[in-house]
Amino acid sequence: MKMAEEKKGFFKRLVNGLTKTRDNIVAGFDSIFSGYSSIDEEFYEELEEILIMGDIGINATSAIIEKLKEQVSEQHIKNPAECKQLLIDGIKDQMRVDSTEYAFENQKSVILVIGVNGVGKTTSVGKLAGKLKDQGKKVILAAADTFRAAAGEQLAQWANRAGVDLIGGQAGADPASIVYDAVAAAKARNADVLICDTAGRLHNKKNLMEELRKIYRILEREYPEAYLETLVVLDGTTGQNALAQAKQFAEVANVNGIILTKLDGTAKGGIAVAIQSELDIPVKYIGVGEQIDDLQKFDADAFVNALFDVDEKDLGTEE
């Protein structure tokens, strides 16, 4: 019951947080569905324009519209209003990805968290630590983003809030050596999850690749029994830039999932559709606020429902 209540509460926040995106997309749709008396090429072009403006991305949009055209033709649909549910289902289909498991919840794990400055990376690490701690896990944080002076202090505050141990080093210290120390601590203290806050200097890809390679090597050598998850943090307010960043990180790291932050108050929430559709990398968590519990597991169907403000009456039926 508590789970259902929490989920309902989060869905409500998601609906509120996506207000700008919804105004951007849905208001346009409604005027098209009510403003057109027949389905023609102009009708499709208008829909396409709204999807692209909502940051759903050109490729995903083309696929959604093509599928809609096929269905309209097959089902001999004449009334534009009948396209709305088909469109919602089409967006959900575009967001299907191969794997959305949270394998790190069920075994000894290391989670590497990467992302450029300013996306809310360190905050996300802190919130994720709190989330896993609430699940009864022993969590250790590693402050391996030594490039940004304030990152360590910020992470220390989050570790304090979440009630978890933190392994850090001096500003400018070698991130790989901090990860090495953190692995030793994780093993000695029998931690379930070690979360490493690592730098993400995309403008210097060569250095970033080297740094990540070193970290991966240490983890393989020192902690081969741990499952490794790499999460990229992206700022939802940056729209297509976030997609470009995700692509670049996927080139240098084995990315298992995305944390999409700052979705409250952005008109670019459609980027979640573009990421899953184009990269086949699941968005695993989304942030819609500043509180420690404002990082929640991502549910693509609930997200699209919130985008269209579809009533989630049966929200409490699943975990």
Annotated model-derived regions:
Residues K92-M95, T100-E319:
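P-loop/Walker A NTP-binding module and the surrounding RecA-like catalytic core of P-loop NTPases
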Residues M1-T100, N106-V113, L128-G130, D134, ...:
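Non-catalytic terminal/linker segments enriched in charged/polar, low-complexity residues
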